[in-house]
Amino acid sequence: MAVFTELFWITLKIMALVVPLMLAVAYLTYAERRVIGAMQDRRGPNRVGYQGLLQPIADALKLVMKEISIPSNANRVLFVIAPLLAIMPALAAWAVIPVAEGWAIADINAGLLYILAMTSLGVYGIIIAGWASNSKYALLGTLRASAQVVSYEIAMGFALVGVLMAAGSMNLGQIIQAQAGGIFHWFWLPLLPLFLVYWISGVAETNRAPFDVAEGESEIVAGFHVEYSGTSFAVFFLAEYANMILISAVAAVMFLGGWYSPFHGWPILGPMLDWVPGVVWFMLKTAFFMFCYLWFRATFPRYRYDQIMRLGWKVLIPVTVVWLIVLTIFIVTGFGPWF
């Protein structure tokens, strides 16, 4: 009976996290179209429901009702399971992310390592999709995506090593507690170069603009999912947006104090805003980074493939190595309120 009760509570916690996450993914697509529409001086979707609020549901129904066509020369088994391999790591990574104090499915001491592992596993779904499709365009998109993830995973890993050094722990809850205080106590300030490297690497890892060469419509006809349609295409679509939310949430945890208020400890604003739950601050910080994704897409043109590789290997990795040395000096000398 005790085992059944434990399994029931674990399942309940997973559902309480996955269902809102899937809703957030669906409405992020709506937000993207509205925000980019506003930036381009147009309205965006506004016909389905009030102000277009039912547009994601209409899009989902359209994709579900479409036929899933499998190319005649494709590897059928791998072709079908590739979308699942793309979305599962994006959802599984949320198991260790504390959305508020004590609100995590699994509070493990190697949470940071687990996050790095999950973010790098998603590329296997892309690789398998490109190879199983038996299409030269899909294969080219796969090669680009895998090289890009390998290049930027190193820079992202080094950036998160800086967080590990500053917090002295790989437990995400303890990393947030090490940033207890207002906005100037968070790690974004002493780790500013690492923060910027992490964010640029995160955008590149999710294959979003301006690093979306894996889906270069003008070059390789939408890249690795060119042969997918219907529900299987929708799953790839969900995986991309779920990864965007994941990278944004990890940025909020690692550099922006997680559930802490930016005014925590301030003489006047601090007590006035103490009533706001930590989960609200966490969601606001995550939403800020998701808005940055949309802002980048509306602002920057797509980089050339060689420019992306040069940025990853010749700029971001050297910056992280240099700042890790500077951070070591900060820690040894006890610089500022962070160490």
Curated annotation (Swiss-Prot):
Q: List, alphabetically, the InterPro entries matched.
A: NADH_UbQ_OxRdtase_su1/FPO, NADH_UbQ_OxRdtase_su1_CS
Please name the GO terms that the record assigns under molecular function: NADH dehydrogenase activity; oxidoreductase activity, acting on NAD(P)H, quinone or similar compound as acceptor; quinone binding
Q: Which GO terms describe its biological process?
A: aerobic respiration
Top EC class of this enzyme: translocase
CC terms in the record's Gene Ontology section:
plasma membrane
Q: Where are the transmembrane segments?
A: 7-27, 77-97, 112-132, 149-169, 180-200, 235-255, 276-296, 315-335
The record gives the membrane topology as: Multi-pass membrane protein
Give the protein name, as stated in the record: NADH-quinone oxidoreductase subunit H
